[in-house]
């Protein structure tokens, strides 16, 4: 066999094989490669978007956390102010109640003191009249007795 004819036959067979591959095998392979490239590109874009979204979400979370801390601080300050206000009001109310109770106690004490004085005056007057009766050894009539008691009570 001639080497030229074999080489020519192999070249024709190879050309037909290349043509067949280019016609029927190559387009689906290229389509699969292009689809894969598109998926990879879309995946990279999605990853970039996700990274940007993550950065944005972290920034938002950070700002919301700062806002929440600021709000919490304001609420705590308001609560402390309200606590101080309530304590001041309670102190004022307690002081007012104390003054009221002291005034009532002083009034009761004064009334009791006056009642005791009046009672003591009456007892002293009665004892004085009894002593005077014994000294005089005679009984004084009721009108005279009352006048003497009133007179002694007024002097005391």
From Swiss-Prot:
It comes from the Bacteria. One of its GO terms (cellular component) is proton-transporting ATP synthase complex. Keywords: ATP synthesis, Cell inner membrane, Cell membrane, CF(0), Hydrogen ion transport, Ion transport, Membrane, Transmembrane, Transmembrane helix, Transport. It is found in: Cell inner membrane. GO terms for molecular function: proton-transporting ATP synthase activity, rotational mechanism; proton-transporting ATPase activity, rotational mechanism. The chain crosses the membrane at residues 7-29. CDD domains: ATP-synt_Fo_b. It is a single-pass membrane protein. PANTHER family: ATP SYNTHASE SUBUNIT B (PTHR33445:SF1), ATP SYNTHASE SUBUNIT B', CHLOROPLASTIC (PTHR33445). F-type ATPases have 2 components, F(1) - the catalytic core - and F(0) - the membrane proton channel. F(1) has five subunits: alpha(3), beta(3), gamma(1), delta(1), epsilon(1). F(0) has three main subunits: a(1), b(2) and c(10-14). The alpha and beta chains form an alternating ring which encloses part of the gamma chain. F(1) is attached to F(0) by a central stalk formed by the gamma and epsilon chains, while a peripheral stalk is formed by the delta and b chains. Belongs to the ATPase B chain family. F(1)F(0) ATP synthase produces ATP from ADP in the presence of a proton or sodium gradient. F-type ATPases consist of two structural domains, F(1) containing the extramembraneous catalytic core and F(0) containing the membrane proton channel, linked together by a central stalk and a peripheral stalk. During catalysis, ATP synthesis in the catalytic domain of F(1) is coupled via a rotary mechanism of the central stalk subunits to proton translocation. Component of the F(0) channel, it forms part of the peripheral stalk, linking F(1) to F(0). This is ATP synthase subunit b. It comes from Vibrio vulnificus (strain YJ016).
